[in-house]
Structure formats: structure tokens, C-alpha cells
Amino acid sequence: MANKQDLIAKVAEATELTKKDSAAAVDAVFSAVSSYLAKGEKVQLIGFGNFEVRERAARKGRNPQTGEEIKIKASKVPAFKAGKALKDAVK
């Protein structure tokens, strides 16, 4: 499994940037995607995929410790849907 440091190293290798500059670039991309999602906007990267915010409806659940039925409030969650090129690359 690759982590953020692995991604930074890969970006540095591919772009000939320093690891420090690559880390700044990776952080900037993550920050930009987070910012758009926080405003409820979709981020579409052609060929790679789409980041979006999805609504989760209110629902009933159970407290696993007591078995008591509880109400779970509606919420918004970030979601990613892979694009065709990414799906094809993984096959």
C-alpha cells in the first residue's frame, strides 16, 4: 500500500522537483480538492475520476452495546468515482 510519502517521492521522480517542492504540490492538490468539496462543488479530473459530496439520508441504527434503536442524522460524505482511464489501468 502506498502512502502520502510514497506519492510525494513518485511526483518528485516524475517531475524532477525536490521532495520538498513535491510535498508542497501534493498538499496543494489535496487542499484544493478539500476546499471545493467543502463548498459542495464537484471536482472532475478527466480520465482519472470525480470527487463529489453525497448526501446520506437520515436512518435508524442500533447502539451495539445496548441494542437500543437510535436515530442517525442525515449527513454529507465525500465520495470518489473512478474514471474510465483509471478503471482500464487497474484491470
From Swiss-Prot:
PROSITE patterns: HISTONE_LIKE (PS00045). The keyword DNA-binding applies. Gene3D superfamilies: IHF-like DNA-binding proteins (4.10.520.10). GO terms for molecular function: DNA binding; structural constituent of chromatin. Keywords: DNA condensation, DNA-binding, Virulence. It comes from the Bacteria. GO terms for biological process: chromosome condensation. Coiled coil: none annotated. GO terms for cellular component: cytosol. It holds the Pfam family Bac_DNA_binding. InterPro entries: Hist_DNA-bd (IPR000119), Histone-like_DNA-bd_CS (IPR020816), IHF-like_DNA-bd_dom_sf (IPR010992). Histone-like DNA-binding protein which is capable of wrapping DNA to stabilize it, and thus to prevent its denaturation under extreme environmental conditions. Also seems to act as a fortuitous virulence factor in delayed sequelae by binding to heparan sulfate-proteoglycans in the extracellular matrix of target organs and acting as a nidus for in situ immune complex formation. PANTHER family: DNA-BINDING PROTEIN HU (PTHR33175), DNA-BINDING PROTEIN HU-BETA (PTHR33175:SF3). Belongs to the bacterial histone-like protein family. This is DNA-binding protein HU. It comes from Streptococcus mutans serotype c (strain ATCC 700610 / UA159).
